[in-house]
Amino acid sequence: MPRFPDQLLYIGGRYVPARGGHTFEVVNPATGEVLANVHNADADDLDAAVDSAKAGQRHWAALTVVERSRILLRAVALLRERNDALAELETLNTGKPLSETRSVDIVTGADVLEYYAGVAQALQGVQVPLREGSFFYTRHEPLGVVGAIGAWNYPIQIALWKAAPALAAGNAMIFKPSEVTPLTALKLAEIFTEAGLPDGVFNVLPGDGASVGHALTEHPEIEKISFTGGTATGRKVMASASSSSLKDVTMELGGKSPLIVCADADLDLAADIAMMANFYSSGQVCTNGTRVFVPRALRTAFEARLLARVQRIHIGDPLDERTTFGPMVSAAHMQRVLEHIEQGKAEGARLLFGGERLRDGALAQGCYVAPTIFSDCTDVMTIVREEIFGPVLSLLTYDDEDEAITRANATSYGLAAGVVTPDLSRAHRLIHRLEAGICWINTWGESPAPMPVGGYKQSGVGRENGLATLQAYTRTKSVQVELERYASVF
């Protein structure tokens, strides 16, 4: 018997059953418990959502910016009021520790919504004189109905990252959460409605890619797609979106990000950063710094610091507030991570810690993989080249800065990068040479609302967050005004 009742689709400000009658199970990855049967949307449901979104968007766009912002700020207040309940639901669905979901997931999502409610007035055009008696001006108009596809690792945060700029700019959104973790997106839809968002402006269609995701990307009445997920899937989404109606796309994709520890770095600080860059959220973070470059002479000392820290990780029930490391999000993902670990062993990486599924006591019921550290890694190893999206740190040594930069950039990815050094001149010099969209100096992982987030190369197209993202959910109209009598050449 599932813990929760059947979860329906959210269309037009209310819950409705899927027209096809199909459902799928959502499972707690820490225990194997079935949490709910979720209705699986299809193309017919999408058509209904688009019709609802078009009607709602006309009303939403007709409101003043201030009126829209007031509604969004009411949603912010509701999110913060229900932080603990939403965090517990997120923990049940994702397996992330409650200590994490309470302090990060809903909090940072609400921060982004608050940010866009505040900066929506910044959507201002320009007025440019052309000559005496003639000028032009520009205005930013909403795109209309936009689609978004979320990832399973930060379900409600990603939903808010995508919805906030879209709604602030006057659009309606159809959001497809990951079929692995769809529960909190539905709660977000309830909150938007309670806050006063017009019916149809935020719809949630749970389901898999084949049933509804592909239909969403190619629907001719959807003007933009924002996608977060793997690079391979991102290519398919982009191809489908462009072939159907030349949709604009934003893609936040995979990464294999480098963290460079400089020769003058405080090794304790560097080890703390490397731990957070690899084992936070059990390693299931797209920006993780999984390729850790350390000077050859410092390898042994750095290994010792990592080993001391990794043994302090508290692995256990995600609902226990002492837990700092939970399971993989699903059995299928756990198996993929374990296969990469075995490949690392087979290709000659030296296993320092972990490298196995955890089966002690209650952990055996869940999808737990030990935090894993490999040393003596080389650039050609699969664990160094491919995104694992799990708790696997690859330690590499280098001899000089030029070598470190060259090797750090020798990847098809370019999502994030970091440098640890007390020498800020060196830090900026290295960061400016690294081919990555998000960079950190002496820290890792924070993505505040005003800071654009996105990748270079195969790690993405466009940006999330920041002022430019608000503009990306609009189209620019140019209007020339002639004050004098128009002179025809005919």
Swiss-Prot record:
SUPFAM superfamilies: ALDH-like. It catalyses: betaine aldehyde + NAD(+) + H2O = glycine betaine + NADH + 2 H(+). Binds 2 potassium ions per subunit. It is an enzyme of class 1 (oxidoreductase). The record marks D248 as: Seems to be a necessary countercharge to the potassium cations. K(+) 2 binds at L246, K457, G460. Keywords: Metal-binding, NAD, NADP, Oxidation, Oxidoreductase, Potassium. Pathway: Amine and polyamine biosynthesis; betaine biosynthesis via choline pathway; betaine from betaine aldehyde: step 1/1. Gene3D superfamilies: Aldehyde Dehydrogenase, Chain A, domain 1 (3.40.605.10), Aldehyde Dehydrogenase, Chain A, domain 2 (3.40.309.10). The keyword NAD applies. NAD(+) binds at G150, A151, W152, K176, P177, S178, E179, G230, T231, A232, T233, G254, C286, E387. One of its GO terms (molecular function) is betaine-aldehyde dehydrogenase (NAD+) activity. Dimer of dimers. Belongs to the aldehyde dehydrogenase family. NCBIfam families: BADH, PRK13252.1. PANTHER family: ALDEHYDE DEHYDROGENASE-RELATED. This is Betaine aldehyde dehydrogenase. It comes from Xanthomonas campestris pv. campestris (strain ATCC 33913 / DSM 3586 / NCPPB 528 / LMG 568 / P 25).
